[in-house]
Design a protein with these regions (language model features):
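Extracellular beta-helix/beta-solenoid repeat scaffolds
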Residues: 53-184, 203-229, 233, 238-282, ...
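Acidic/polar low-complexity surface segments
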Residues: 98-132, 136-161, 178-179, 183-184, ...
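Short edge beta-strand/loop segments characteristic of extracellular beta-sandwich folds
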Residues: 197-199, 214, 706-712
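Long, low-complexity serine/threonine/glycine- and acidic-rich segments characteristic of extracellular
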Residues: 686-690, 698-700, 704-706, 712-775
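C-terminal accessory/interaction regions of large nucleic acid-associated machines
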Residues: 528, 535-683
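Extracellular beta-sheet-rich ligand-binding/adhesion modules
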Residues: 16-155, 169-176, 180-186, 190, ...
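Bacterial N-terminal signal peptides
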Residues: 2-9
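Right-handed parallel beta-helix
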Residues: 44, 264, 288-297, 319-332, ...
Length: 776
């Protein structure tokens, strides 16, 4: 009956035409009169339900429940929420609108789009403007759908509309939860299969949902080998499709593809993806979180700041907000942009097909954000955006891109992306020196060269099947500037497979542990300068498994140590497994290897060698010292091999001291036995960085506050303390934690959480919440 009422109240086509052509200031506005249902005439001034082409305002103090599934033709021009608009959680709803602005203001002006007025903190005594499309405690029910269609209306600013914008208000989108938004394949999926097996059971997936099965071979995504299908059946760990697969997808052994569900029952979409697309934006001092919502066909192509999902210059004012389980797909401008924003938690999200980088940290000031267990699929190359903050970014299509590494990246997978899976890029220019204002652990701000900031944590990440050049490009362009040897970049438990260039490490001071690479090139174009590698496997490479310093420049600046290096099934074709660098401009360059193994080595060339100069240009050595390579224990305990180039100063000074020893040496390298050479320790890591804690959820039940949160640290977290009590560790290292506290009858109640790590560092800037409902 509510739908019929809406149609009857607005029936004059002439009004639509007039509203569309009128100037924004002349368009009639209808305001709420009281709290009530959208479909109730008594809720609105004049007793008239909002009609197509109108401006609508929910006034301060009013709570309006959106309870209609309006026809697509009924498009509200703009919706200004100064009070609260909440979508009915138990019935299907649809809202077509040109602009939603969540702001505590009586104005219905469509200007001031960038919310500059909210640079200063708003008065805490004033109520927030609120948009609730479900809440974390009561999401939109699984059997219904809430749909917002962002629809361009003639006369609106094309560069900014249609849009949803939150200006110091609260904006929440919460759909029915899924146990997993994406999982690994449990068995191989072959061409012609109409059913696949998942690596684990899932709940929340249903017949009719759209899924994607990721490409698993190098370069496949150019032919759209990441395949979309519709679920036709589900049984246990098996999912059936409407159509058979057209390609094979790996699903056993060490490397498996992924299957991801794109659908949610809370949807924000562009009404005209081929025309003017919509975008969403949170501004400074806003609040709210997102869980299990779908953002599809959003993002304005080639337009700065108009992204599918955008946290814009929020600083630390949105600490406590999170994006969990979201699906962001078909974007013309990124999936999720974190711009000048700290402490955001992004977990279990799926990004599929974007123009330009996918999960994107925009301007180099972002710190203490957590990106955990997200899947990035087919971020495709775009163009540089006009007036972008960092001019060096070519927007070439990285699954994950950042310029400031002081963030946490864990358990993420980048599959079938454009130029990069993971890309850290910070290149100074004549106009930009990269000394930027960065928040410190105590909350103060300091001017820091962002190239000197290492990861909080980079662990358990994976990249495969890139259609462009790189799996993981760490710091190409930093010009040898990075953290010192006591605060190195640390990369742990990384898988890189079926890409062209596996790992390009160009930062100084780097510790890599437990990395597996299966690609055309292994460790490529490295800047070996205080680099430490432990337990590295390079498999099935055909060219330059372990490249010389800076590739064709053949130059090494510092110490390299490798402890545990296995080459498996490499097809080197006369190329050495380990290349020697020619030049040593600092005089300190040297390489030490221990535990080198070559398994199933496929090379019938007479130039077969473990250590040699290798292919590519042969620059004439220019420095007084070369770069010797020590293979510890090669001749037995305490009997080490010193391998040098036959063009090096060391060889030319004492040629009789060296000899050929295939397959260790090749046509341009020889070896001398040396005794008991020390295996150096070029890094001396210390942990002086305090942990970072975020309260992500607070709910009141049975007289208690039930509190959830996350914590990140570069070392081991010893404890999380909330109001003087220790929280429970839900996942390792307190990545997620929980606690229950007695709810005090007085309001508001203050909740304070901080963490302490095993090195004795205590968080200097606890997360403090005053007033706990609604949250955040």
């Amino acid at each position: 009956m509510a739908l019929i009422t809406v149609i009857i109240v607005f029936s004059a086509a002439d009004d639509i035409s007039h509203a569309a052509e009128a100037k924004p200031a002349d368009i009639p506005a209808i305001r709420s009169l009281r709290t009530g249902a959208w479909s109730d005439t008594a809720t609105w001034e004049g007793g008239r339900i909002p009609a197509a082409g109108m401006k609508v305002q929910v006034r301060p103090g009013h709570v309006v429940t959106y309870d209609v599934e309006a026809p697509e033709s009924l498009v509200i021009r703009s919706l200004h929420i100064a009070g609260t608009l909440t979508f009915a959680p138990d019935k299907s709803t649809r809202l077509s609108v040109g602009l939603i602005k969540v702001e505590n203001s009586e104005s219905t002006d469509e200007e001031g789009f960038d919310c500059d007025a909210h640079a200063e903190e708003p008065d805490a005594a004033q109520p927030r403007a609120v948009l609730l499309v479900g809440t974390a405690e009561r999401p939109i029910a699984v059997n219904v759908r809430a749909l917002i269609r962002l629809t361009y209306i003639a006369g609106m600013k094309q560069e900014s509309c249609p849009a949803i914008v939150c200006c110091a208000g609260r904006m929440d989108f919460h759909g029915a939860p899924l146990s997993r938004t994406w999982v690994k394949l449990g068995t191989p999926a072959a061409k012609g299969d109409k059913q696949v097996t998942l690596s684990e059971p899932v709940t929340g997936w249903k017949v009719g949902d759209t899924i994607v099965v990721t490409a698993t071979q190098f370069g496949e995504s150019k032919d759209n080998v990441t395949e979309e299908r519709t679920i036709s059946s589900m049984s246990g760990n098996s999912v059936g499709f409407d159509e058979p697969l057209a390609h094979d997808h790996s699903g056993t052994g060490e490397f498996q593809g992924e299957i991801a569900n794109l659908n949610r029952n809370v949807v924000v979409e562009s009404a005209d993806p081929a025309g003017e697309r919509g975008h969403t934006m949170y501004h400074r001092h806003s609040a709210g979180s997102i869980s299990y919502a779908e953002f599809r066909n959003l993002g304005k192509k080639d337009t700065l700041g108009r992204y599918s999902l955008h946290f814009h210059l929020a600083g630390s004012t949105m600490r406590g907000s999170s994006v969990v389980g979201a699906s962001i797909h078909g974007s013309h401008n990124r999936w999720l942009t974190i711009h000048g924003t700290n402490y955001l938690v992004v977990r279990d999200c799926v990004g599929y097909r974007s123009v330009g980088h996918g999960f994107f940290l925009e301007d180099g000031t972002e710190v203490y954000n957590v990106l955990d267990r997200n899947l990035a699929v087919e971020a495709r190359p775009g163009r540089k955006l006009p007036k972008q903050v960092l001019p060096f970014d070519q927007n070439e299509g990285a699954g994950f891109w950042w310029a400031n590494s002081l963030n946490t990246f864990t358990r993420n997978v980048a599959a079938a992306n454009g130029h990069y899976g993971f890309r850290y890029e910070a290149t100074p220019t004549s106009a930009l020196k990269l000394v930027l204002p960065v928040m410190q652990s105590d909350g103060s701000e300091a001017a820091i060269d962002i190239r000197t900031l290492p990861f909080v944590r980079f662990e358990d990440n994976e990249v495969h099947s890139s259609q462009g050049l790189y799996g993981f490009n760490l710091g190409e362009g930093v010009q040898r500037i990075g953290p010192d040897a006591r605060h190195p970049f640390v990369v742990r438990n990384t898988k890189i497979w079926n890409v062209h260039y596996g790992f390009r490490p160009q930062v100084p001071s780097l510790l890599v542990e437990n990395m597996t690479i299966q690609s055309h090139y292994g460790v490529y174009h490295p800047n070996f300068d205080n680099h430490v590698y432990r337990n590295i496997t390079i498999r099935q490479t055909s060219t330059e498994p372990f490249n010389r310093g800076h590739d064709d420049d053949s130059i090494q600046y510092g110490v390299l140590t490798v402890d545990g290096l296995t080459f498996d099934s490499c097809r080197s074709g006369g190329m050495p497994l380990i290349q020697i660098s020619d030049d040593n401009p600092t005089g300190n360059a040297v390489s030490h290897f221990r535990g080198v193994n070559a398994l199933n080595w496929q090379d019938n060339s007479r130039d077969k060698a473990i250590v040699n100069l290798g292919g590519g240009p042969r620059p004439t050595p220019k420095t007084e010292k070369g770069v010797p390579i020590y293979i510890h224990g090669w001749f037995g305990p305490g009997r080490d091999a010193m391998v040098v180039s036959t063009r090096s100063p060391e060889f030319k000074a004492r040629p009789a001291a060296f000899h050929a020893e295939p397959p260790l040496t090749g046509n341009q390298s020889q070896v001398a036995e040396v005794a008991n050479v020390d295996f150096p320790q070029p890094l001396d890591p210390i942990d002086d960085l305090p942990p970072a804690t975020v309260i992500t959820d607070i709910r009141k039940h049975d007289g208690k506050w039930h509190i959830l949160g996350t914590c990140s640290d570069n070392g081991a977290v010893a404890r999380v303390v909330v109001n003087g009590r220790e929280a429970r560790e839900l996942t390792p290292n307190f990545a997620t934690w929980a606690i229950e506290l007695d709810a005090q009858p007085q309001a508001p109640q203050t909740i304070v959480a901080h963490a302490e790590d095993a090195a004795g560092n205590i968080e200097k800037l606890p997360h403090r919440v005053v007033g706990t409902m609604p949250w955040p």
